[in-house]
A protein has these predicted regions:
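Conserved C-terminal segment of the DHp
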Residues: 13-31
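Glycine-rich/acidic phosphate-handling loop/turn and adjacent ATP-lid/helix
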Residues: 141-170
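Conserved phosphoacceptor histidine of two-component systems
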Residues: 1-12
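Short beta-strand/loop element within the Bergerat-fold HATPase_c
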Residues: 129-142, 149
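Conserved catalytic submotifs in the C-terminal HATPase_c
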Residues: 89-99, 106, 139
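Conserved DHp (HisKA) dimerization/phosphotransfer helix of two-component histidine kinases, i.e.
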Residues: 16-17, 34-89
Length: 199
């Protein structure tokens, strides 16, 4: 993992240099396309550094700080709400009352956020039409099942792929769910998460 840390530090150094160049270009009133190119470079460096941070997190053991009585449906609603503000539709459907579990609230919120982002990337209509339906089902007294439907058929397992930023985050989301004693899988054009209610 040290090499990943070193790469991230190098990317951050390049970002500082690119930011310095952008300021000089802005002061010298250079053409707009040069400013745009530097902006894209900085955004790309940010994404690469973020991916490296996620890989570092994936390589470390998941340490949970569980709390009893966490309302899983509220954590999921909060994690998905930001996507509706960007125009991506995620529709929550709950077939049960509030579901409480003994979980790490913050790590579970991250996992749900990455699952929502992955669902939007893999939705049936990549052009943005159609919503992602998220259904919370209390399968038994001891576990809850959460499904993200409206996805297209994939030729790979998005939770084990590491093919790009979204898949890296889906792999980490699955690892967090598994650390809680649950599972995350892609089946029948759905993300299906099974989460125990007590640890």
């Amino acid at each position: 993992m040290q090499i990943v840390h070193d790469l991230k530090n190098q990317l951050n150094g390049l970002k500082l240099y690119a930011t310095f160049l952008r300021r000089r270009i802005e002061k010298s009133e250079r053409p707009g396309d040069e400013q745009e190119t530097i902006g894209k470079l900085i955004n790309g460096l940010d994404r690469a550094a973020d991916d490296l941070s996620t890989i570092v997190r994936y390589g470390q053991p998941v340490e949970l700080k569980k709390q009893a009585g966490v309302e899983v449906d509220k954590v999921l609603r909060a994690a998905s709400s930001g996507f509706n503000e960007t125009g991506s539709q995620i529709v929550m459907e709950s077939s049960s009352d509030s579901v409480q579990a003994e979980v790490d609230h913050f790590k579970l919120a991250d996992a749900f956020k990455w699952l929502c982002a992955g669902a939007i990337k893999h939705r049936q209509n990549p052009d943005g039409a159609g919503a992602i339906a998220v259904t919370i089902k209390a399968a038994t007294a001891s576990q809850v099942v959460i499904e993200w439907s409206g996805l297209r058929q994939l030729d790979h397992d998005p939770f084990r792929s590491f093919a790009g930023s979204d898949e890296i985050k889906l792999a980490l989301a699955a690892k967090i769910i598994e650390a809680h004693g649950g599972s995350a899988q892609f089946t029948d054009k759905k993300f299906v998460v099974v989460l125990p209610l007590s640890g």
